[in-house]
Amino acid sequence: MFNRRLLRHVRYAFQQVRSNHSLQERIDAIPIERYRNFSIVAHVDHGKSTLSDRLLELTNVIKPGGKQVLDKLEVERERGITIKAQTCSMFYQDPRTKLDYLLHLVDTPGHVDFRAEVSRSYASCGGALLLVDASQGVQAQTVANFYLAYSMDLKLIPVINKIDLDIADIDQAEEQVENMFELPKSDCIKVSAKTGLHVEQLLPAIVDRIPPPTGKVEKPLRALLVDSWYDSYLGVVLLVHIVDGQVKRGDKIITAANGLKYEVRECGIMYPDRVATNTLKSGQVGYLVPGMKESKDAKIGDTLMHLGKESITEVLPGFEEPKPMVFVGAFPADGAEFKALDDDISRLVLNDRSVSLQRETSNALGQGWRLGFLGSLHASVFTERLEKEYGSKLILTQPTVPFLIKFKDGEKKIITNPDDFPDLSLRRSNLESLEEPFVEAIMTLPQEYLGKVIQLCDDSHGVQKEITYLNMTGQVMLRYELPLSYLVDDFFGKLKSVSRGYASLDYEDVGYKQSDIVKLELLVNGKSVDALAQVMHRDQTEHIGKEWVKKFKKFIKSQLFEVVIQARANNKIIARETIKAKRKDVLSKLHASDISRRKKLLSKQKQGKKNMKTVGNIQINQDAFQSFLRR
C-alpha cells in the first residue's frame, strides 16, 4: 500500500517536471515582440472576472465552466468583487499566422478602495480592455479607471459586455464610449462574457492593438515589484514585471529600496496557479521566491537588480505606497482571547500590506488595536476575512478618518484616534488650525434622481464642482468635493437609497482642508467612555448627541444608584438621560405609626445612594458596546 502511494507521488512529480519543461520550451520559442501584457478596466460588477474566465478557457488554461478563477479569496467569491489583483499567463496561437503569443492578463479590482492595486497592475501592462456594461452604460469607476489607464499611456480596446440581456442598450453604450472617451464606435467589440458570445474576437484584437513590452533581455536585470503575498512554506512570494534582463533560480539579487540581498529559490509564471520555470525574462510577469521572511521587506514599486550590477542599473520610478484613510478601533469580544486574536490579525496583515496595525488600550474595552484601511469596504472585507478564515470575533468602533492638527509653533500632528483629539483649553492656546481630508467624488445617476442626490451631497458639507448631462442617455455625472468623514459614514449606502440603487460612485483624494470639527464624547456618571468618542462637524453634534444618550440608555442595566448618561462636545453638555436607581424597600418591617424612624431610614438610604453614585463603578458589559456600535 505504502509503495503504491509512493509510486503515485513519484509519477505525479515526474509529470509535473515534464509539464513545466514543455511550458518553458514553449515560452523560450516566443520572442518578446509576441508578448502582450494587458488588464481589464471596468466598474464593479460589469463582468471583469467572468470575462477573465472566458479568456482563460479559450486559451486552454482552465476547463470550461470554471467560475471566478482569479478571485481566489472566499470573500471575493461571496461578494462577487475582486480585492487582490491577480495575474495569469496564457498561450494563444493566432489562426491567421499560426504564430504563438504569450499573453499576461492582470485581473484588477474595480472598487475605489483598491485603487492602489489597480495602478500597480497597470504599471506592468501595455494596454487594457475597457469594459462597459450594455445594460448600465458608463459608470463612475469606469470613468476614474479610464483616466488612470489613459494617464499611464495604455492602449485601450473598448468592449461592450452583457449584450445578451433583454435590457441591454448597445447603441447607448457605444455612444457613451465615443462621447466620453473619444474612442470610435467602430473599435467597440460587443460580447457576452456570461455566454461566451463573440469573446473569441478579443484575442486577435489584443494581438493587433496592444503593443509588446519594450525591454531588452541583454540589459542588466530590472524587475518591478508589483505585489507580494505570504506563503507559510515559501515565505514572501513576489509578483514582478521583468522590465529588462532575465532572472533564474540561484541568481543573487538586491533590492534598490533597502539594499537587502537574496538568492532566488524559485521563479515562474502564474498559470493560473504557480508553475515553476527555469527563467523569467524581459517582458514577462511572474513570481519570485527570494527567501524573504517578512512582508514589510517587500517595498511595492521597488526595483530588483542582480547583485554586483546595481551601479550600472537604472532604478525604475516605482509608485507610492497607499496611505490608510479610514481607522477603526478593534477589540476582542472576549478579553481572554487577545493573544490568539493578535496572532490571527498579524497573519492576515502579512497578506494585506495596505493595513496599518498599532496596539492600543481602552479604559472601556481593554487591550486592542488601531487598524488603518484604504476605505470602508476594505475595513469590512478585512474583518469578514478575519471571522471566516480564523473564526475571530471583534468589537469595532465607528470608523474615523485622520485629522491634521497644526500648531502655532509650526508643528503638525496626524490624529487617527478620536480620544487623542485636543481639548478646548489647548485649542485656545497653542492650536492654529484643525484640518480633515477631502475627496473629489464622481457620481453617475439617472437624471430623475438628481435633486435628491444634490440634497444628500449638500447635507454632507459637499461643494459642487461640475455637472455634466451625458448625451441622449438620461444620465448625469456629478463632481462634488466632500469631507472624507461623510464618505465613510455610509455615504454610498445613502446614495444607493436615494437613487434606488442606480447611482455609482468613485472618488480621489484632494488633500486636507480646514474644518469646524469637534470631539463628541459619551459620559457615564461624568466619566468619558473613550471607545465611543467621535470627531465630527460642529453642526452634527446636537442631534447625534441626543441619539447617543437615548440609544446607550437601552443597554445599561439599572444600578442601586442613579446613572447619568451625557453627551459632551466642546466641553459643553448637549444631551442627557438618567437611569433611576433601583429602590430597596427599607420600610417593609416598620410599624405604620413610627414616623420619625421612617424619616430617618429614608434619609439614610438617600445619603447611601449619593455616596454610591460618587464612588460606584458601573460595569458595562461587552454586549452593551457591541449593541451600541452596531448600526
Swiss-Prot record:
- EC category name: hydrolase
Which Gene3D superfamilies does this chain map to? 3.30.70.240, Elongation factor 4, C-terminal domain, Elongation Factor G (Translational Gtpase), domain 3, P-loop containing nucleotide triphosphate hydrolases, Translation factors
Task: Indicate the segments annotated as coiled coil, or none if absent.
Answer: none
Q: GO biological process: what's one of them?
A: positive regulation of translation
Disulfide topology: none
Q: Where is this protein found?
A: Mitochondrion inner membrane
Question: What InterPro entries does the annotation carry?
Answer: EF-4, EFG_III/V, EFG_V-like, G_TR_CS, LepA_C_sf, LepA_CTD, LepA_IV, P-loop_NTPase
A molecular function (GO) term:
mitochondrial ribosome binding
Give the record's keywords alphabetically: GTP-binding, Hydrolase, Membrane, Mitochondrion, Mitochondrion inner membrane, Nucleotide-binding, Protein biosynthesis, Transit peptide
Chief localization class? mitochondrion
State the superkingdom.
Answer: Eukaryota
Domain tr-type G: from-to ranges = 33-214
Q: Where does GTP bind?
A: 42-49, 107-111, 161-164
Q: Name one Pfam family in it.
A: EFG_C
* Transit peptide, start-end: 1-19
Q: Which family does it belong to?
A: Belongs to the TRAFAC class translation factor GTPase superfamily. Classic translation factor GTPase family. LepA subfamily.
What the protein does comes down to: Promotes mitochondrial protein synthesis. May act as a fidelity factor of the translation reaction, by catalyzing a one-codon backward translocation of tRNAs on improperly translocated ribosomes. Binds to mitochondrial ribosomes in a GTP-dependent manner.
Name of the protein in its database record:
Translation factor GUF1, mitochondrial
The organism of origin for this protein:
Kluyveromyces lactis (strain ATCC 8585 / CBS 2359 / DSM 70799 / NBRC 1267 / NRRL Y-1140 / WM37) (Yeast)
Q: What is the lineage of its organism?
A: Eukaryota, Fungi, Dikarya, Ascomycota, Saccharomycotina
